[in-house]
Amino acid sequence: MLSLIEQIKSGKLWDFPGGIHPFENKHQSNRQPIINASIPNELVLPLKQHIGKAGDLLVKVGDRVLKGQPLTQYTSTFMLPIHAPTSGVISAIEPRTVAHPSGLSELCIVLTPDQQEEWFELQPQPDFQQLTPETLLELIRQAGISGMGGAGFPTAKKLQSGLSRTEILIINAAECEPYITADDVLMRQYAHEIIQGIEIVEHILKPKLTIIGIEDNKPEAVAALQQAAQDKPMVIRVIPTKYPSGGEKQLIKILTNLEVPKGGIPADIGLMVQNVGSLQAIARAIVHGEPLIRRVVTLTGDCFRKPRNVWALLGTPVQALLNEFGYKADKKLPRLIMGGPMMGFTLPHAQVPITKTANCILAPTRNELTSSDNEMACIRCGQCAEACPVSLLPQQLQWHAKAEEFDKCEELDLKDCIECGACAYVCPSEIPLVQYYRQAKAEIRTRSLEAEAAERAKARFEEKKARMERDKAERENRFKQAAEDRRKEMQQQGGSDAIAAAIERVKAQKAQLEPTDNSVKPAIAAAIARAKAKQAEAAQSGASEPDNSEMAKLREERKRQARERKAQKGEVTEASTSDGADDKKSAVAAAIARAKARKAEQQETESAAQPAQATPSSDDADPKKAAVAAAIARAKARKAEQQETESTAQPAQATPSSDDADPKKAAVAAAIARAKARKAEKQETESAAQPTQATPSSDDADPKKAAVAAAIARAKARKAEQQETESAAQPTQATPSSDDADPKKAAVAAAIARAKARKAAQQSSSNLNAEEKD
């Protein structure tokens, strides 16, 4: 059985599934040789013209640069530098619209040419056989070369992935896209440089076989390559014209019958594929030292007066090429397509710049390429599935992409779609399937990047949390170790812990204060007991307001004790902090303490000896105020006695309806009333005698105020006596309000009157105190 390499050398070819045969229309632009386009007035250079990351800027606005001078630098293998296509001045660094299906804007360097074409210093390496593969890869990377067939993957990175494992090197010269002839004309005119580029790549990868795959619709290019590759160990294989045979996986299938595994790359199966445009750029970079600053662009379509291929400087606005090469827009449907009719996209405007992956500008008329705006519903014919070269299910992919069910799209291997457009070409409903796939891929890519960013943020947070916990544990261990070391050191020195010593000192000071606190507790308890007794007595006697005199005394006692404790604490603190105080200060402090103790003992004795019948404001009362209060109380007692006498005299005048009244009950009630009156008079006499024993609480009371208060009290007493006399004269004229009056009711009324008299006396006393305070 022949090996794979032997089968390839024998001329055997295979085929891939699906595929179509669209109208090629390549003859418009391949009959003219390549010419140089003029230098435009402005060059717009996007920082990112490849798959990967943009390089770091090396220039600023206002700098003058030379032709071939690096404008950015790379710091990773997925970065590529860009170079100045001509000499001039950097006029701006700003976002501009770039070649993208969505018309996105990216950061660009705007260069104003000076038309001098002054070159930067070049470093050619014509004897590349003496250089190592690593050195050659570095030179290729420095030249900024990427895949020029349309993908734009960094060439050096791709070659690096195939080091030491590439068995077959495949040169992609198929150029299957209709209208595009850039590679065809390049092979005709620069076949020698293409072969040089192949030899450089062979020196890097050292493959067992190199095979060039080219479609049979390029006979002139085949002849040029055969002539340039004479006596070279290369196989030039002409393959049938079929779209998309120029796809990497499809060309591998045709030439080797091998399939790239899902999610893998050709290097995984020992293969490496390179485009002829990339190889020509490699030869210029190594042999001549020129970086990638220009490329071949096909200008085709019926809107061009003379379609052809041109060398266009990178960054040249499309409008400059249109103006130079006779473009005349269609009046009803002006369109500019970057790329071919199958895989290209419509430009938003003509100021988009030429980049490393821009191989064609197609300007068709409305009759040449019809618009695809007439989308209709899918009729489920299945032609898209038959035409798919990757054996996908375009119909179901479109359904899920339209419904934004991107997880289903991934399950159906949407990422394997090469966006060749074969499905859309055969669709009778004119559904733009590729547009749905591109949008779905972009959304999936965006979500994937967001998920990766979230995972990175989560990992950073967890690492930070673990680090903080670790630092906290280390700090605690350090503190514990330091405390342990201190403790051991003090034990070794025969001392004790300073903190423990401080605690002991505080406890000792507290113990010194406790006896004083305990000595005053009995006095407080006695005062509380007296206050509770007076409250109980007031409740039994029916008083409406409780006697709070004892509580006032208790509050004063607590304040005094707090002041004494504060003074004692200050004395103890001063004694502990100033050990060198003299004997005089100590004697003075002791005398003050003894005086305060005697004063407290005297106050406790006085509060204990004070009678329980004292009025609520007896501690603060003035002797004159007490006399006034006694006079008021006597007047009210006389008034109450008169009312009782009237109430006992009324039963005799009652109507005949009270025949059941008992004379004995009336006599008993009268006796009770007289006894209560005598008791009230006795209490008044005692209260008048008490002022001499009361301790005045205010030494600054004004005698004039007391005299005024006494006069007011006498006036009120006279008014009360007059009212009593008038009320005593009216009973004979009064009409009894109740025919069933009972002597018991009269007694109850007398008791109520006495209670009201006592309440009025208390209120008048409190009012006098309030006026005195004011």
From Swiss-Prot:
InterPro entries in the record: 4Fe4S_Fe-S-bd, 4Fe4S_Fe_S_CS, Ion_transpt_RnfC/RsxC, Nuo51_FMN-bd, Nuo51_FMN-bd_sf, RnfC_N, Soluble_ligand-bd
Cofactor binding summary note: Binds 2 [4Fe-4S] clusters per subunit.
Pfam families: Complex1_51K (PF01512), Fer4_7 (PF12838), RnfC_N (PF13375), SLBB (PF10531)
Locations listed in the record: Cell inner membrane
Annotated positions binding [4Fe-4S] cluster 2: C388, C417, C420, C423
Gene Ontology molecular-function annotations: 4 iron, 4 sulfur cluster binding; electron transfer activity; metal ion binding
Alphabetical keyword list: 4Fe-4S, Cell inner membrane, Cell membrane, Electron transport, Iron, Iron-sulfur, Membrane, Metal-binding, Repeat, Translocase, Transport
Positions with biased composition (Low complexity): 533-545, 605-618
NCBIfam families linked: PRK05035.1 (NF003454), rnfC (TIGR01945)
Subunit composition and interactions: The complex is composed of six subunits: RnfA, RnfB, RnfC, RnfD, RnfE and RnfG.
The name this protein goes by in its record: Ion-translocating oxidoreductase complex subunit C
Organism listed in the record: Vibrio cholerae serotype O1 (strain ATCC 39315 / El Tor Inaba N16961)
Lineage: Bacteria, Pseudomonadati, Pseudomonadota, Gammaproteobacteria, Vibrionales
